[in-house]
Every structure is written in structure tokens, then in C-alpha cells.
Regions:
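Short loop/turn motifs that initiate or flank beta-strands
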Residues: 1-239
Length: 239
């Protein structure tokens, strides 16, 4: 008589799941470079199971975000994850029971925010030895700095003309170029940022502007002439 019995243990199948990488720019919680939360790859389901793996809503934690995901973290490399309970499979019965889900976190990168200078114009008068006169100050474009960061433009930026521009070609070794308008010929040098959060910003100096060379004023005084009535010739040594 064989009445022996026992228990059967069915262990969970291991399911490796890797998350993809996401990229943001400091100051903007939206993804860049075509990235988004998602599953990069995973092991195949077994035992005839068929279904589509996805990420459970609300399960994501992302080191690239702070303040309840309302702001980006500082520039840097972080991770985002969901944990094993954050992976679900539509159409697979007892998915969480039958699989030991092991998740590899995805990278979450925050790039520096690129900020730009305002264009600036300059002018001079033909033949002037005083150089270019700048119309205003070198400044950052509006809304460049975010989150109340204490970052600003350092004093000392200077405005001149492009060495390879039309103004320089016309000027040569003279004090100024010919009178006229020289578009996109301004060059800004020495522009730097100062502050406590400099690592989160990248200053892009592609500012330019118009150089206007005004005509020089040339006063000309004419001499006096004298004639005698009835004779068109000059007298008194005039002429």
C-alpha cells in the first residue's frame, strides 16, 4: 500500500527588468532628448504566460526630482526606480505571485541649463578716437535664472567688434570703419557668471548686435568777396 504523500513547492521564476534612462534640463521637469519613463528590456515570461509589462502608476521615485517632483535636482547623475511592486503585466494571472521581479534602476540625468546674453548695439562717429559707445549694458536674457538661485552676470564684460566682421574689414588700421550700419558685428567678451549655483548653468555667449557709424560733422566756412559796381571782377584781394 503506497499512501505516501508530501508537499510540492513551486518557487517564483526570476524576472529581470531594466528601466531606461531619462534626461532633463535643470529648471525644467519635462524630459529631453526623446526620453521618458519606461522599461528598457526584461526577461521573457515563462510557463505559457503572455502579457505586456508596464510601470504601475504612482510607483516611480526619481532622484533627479525634488520638492514632490515639482523641481529638478541640481545638475548631475541620479537614478529612478519603481521597485518590484511597481512592475505589472496586463493579461498575466498571479503575475506578482509567480515571479520574483528584480528591477535595475534607470539613470536620471539633469543637464545644466543653457542661458544666453541679450543682443546689444553700439555706435560711433566716423573718425572718432573714442571707440564704440554701447547702447545699454551687457545682460542676461529674461527668465534665465530659475528657482531663485543667486546667480548673476559678473561685472567686467566688454563690447567690441568681431575681428572677422565687415566692420573690422572696413576699419583696417583706421580709427573707425566707414559711415554706415554693420549688422551682427558686435562681439561681447569677458562675460562670466557668479553665484552659488554656477554648476547648474552654462553661459552661451553668442550675443551680437548692430554697429552704427555716424557721419562726421564737417563745418566749412566760405570767405568774403568784394566787387565794384559795374565790374564783375573781385577787388580788395578777394576771390
Amino acid at each position: 500500500v503506497n499512501d505516501a504523500t508530501g508537499s510540492i513547492t513551486v518557487k517564483q521564476a526570476t524576472l529581470q527588468v531594466s528601466l531606461n534612462d531619462v534626461v532633463r534640463t535643470y529648471g525644467n521637469t519635462s524630459f529631453t532628448e526623446g526620453t521618458s519613463y519606461g522599461i528598457k528590456n526584461h526577461d521573457a515570461l515563462v510557463n505559457g504566460d503572455e502579457g505586456t509589462l508596464s510601470i504601475k502608476e504612482g510607483a516611480i521615485t526619481d532622484g533627479g526630482l525634488v520638492d514632490n517632483n515639482s523641481k529638478t535636482n541640481n545638475k548631475g547623475d541620479y537614478k529612478w526606480n519603481v521597485g518590484k511592486d511597481g512592475i505589472v503585466a496586463d493579461g498575466v494571472t498571479n503575475f506578482a505571485k509567480n515571479y520574483d521581479i528584480q528591477v535595475t534602476a534607470g539613470n536620471s540625468k539633469v543637464n545644466a541649463k543653457k542661458i544666453y546674453l541679450n543682443n546689444i548695439n553700439a555706435s560711433t562717429t566716423y573718425g572718432s578716437k573714442d571707440g564704440l559707445r554701447v547702447d545699454g549694458n551687457v545682460s542676461l536674457q529674461d527668465n534665465s535664472i530659475v528657482y531663485g538661485d543667486k546667480v548673476s552676470l559678473k561685472d567686467g564684460a566688454s563690447v567690441s567688434y568681431k575681428a572677422d566682421g565687415k566692420y573690422a574689414a572696413s576699419k583696417g588700421d583706421r580709427d573707425t570703419a566707414d559711415a554706415g550700419t554693420y549688422k551682427a558685428d558686435v562681439a561681447v567678451t569677458g562675460a562670466e557668471l557668479v553665484g552659488n549655483e554656477l554648476g547648474n548653468y552654462e553661459l552661451v555667449n553668442n550675443a551680437t548686435g548692430v554697429i552704427t557709424v555716424k557721419k562726421a560733422t564737417l563745418n566749412v566756412g566760405l570767405n568774403d568777396v568784394v566787387r565794384t559796381y559795374g565790374d564783375t571782377s573781385f577787388t580788395d584781394g578777394t576771390g
